[in-house]
């Protein structure tokens, strides 16, 4: 294996281990789920106008002026 292939394998392994340690057992297995997680921040994460929040959350300002994705209330 060359260096680039080893790097990619290590990156994939680290991503899988990180997902398991974070408790994300219900991660969507389809391609759209992977794409959505890559482009939108989840709940309780900082957000910006260029990166909209994931479905079910919206960008709300906190008292410190920082915007966070918060779960929508029914």
From Swiss-Prot:
Keyword Signal: yes
Tissue-wise expression: Expressed by the venom gland.
Keyword Secreted tagged: yes
Critical for the neurotoxic activity, annotated site positions: 45-46, 50-51, 68
Propeptide: 23-35
PROSITE patterns, per database record: J_ACTX
Gene Ontology CC entries for this record: extracellular region
Signal sequence region: 1-22
InterPro entries linked: Toxin_16
Site (Important for the neurotoxic activity): 39, 66
Molecular function GO terms recorded: potassium channel regulator activity; toxin activity
Localization of this protein: Secreted
Disulphide connectivity of cysteines: 40-54, 47-59, 50-51, 53-69
Keywords: Calcium-activated potassium channel impairing toxin, Cleavage on pair of basic residues, Disulfide bond, Ion channel impairing toxin, Knottin, Neurotoxin, Potassium channel impairing toxin, Secreted, Signal, Toxin
Family in the record: Belongs to the neurotoxin 11 (kappa toxin) family.
Function: This excitatory toxin inhibits insect calcium-activated potassium (KCa) channels (Slo-type).
Entry domain remark: The presence of a 'disulfide through disulfide knot' structurally defines this protein as a knottin.
Protein name per Swiss-Prot or TrEMBL: Lambda-hexatoxin-Hv1e
Organism: Hadronyche versuta (Blue mountains funnel-web spider)
């Amino acid at each position: 294996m060359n260096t680039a292939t080893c790097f990619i394998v290590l990156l994939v392994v680290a991503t899988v281990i990180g997902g398991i340690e974070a408790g994300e057992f219900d991660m969507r297995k389809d391609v759209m789920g992977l794409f959505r997680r890559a482009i939108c921040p989840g709940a309780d994460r900082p957000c910006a106008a260029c990166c909209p929040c994931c479905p079910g959350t919206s960008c709300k300002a906190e008292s410190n002026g920082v915007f966070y994705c918060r779960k929508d209330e029914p």
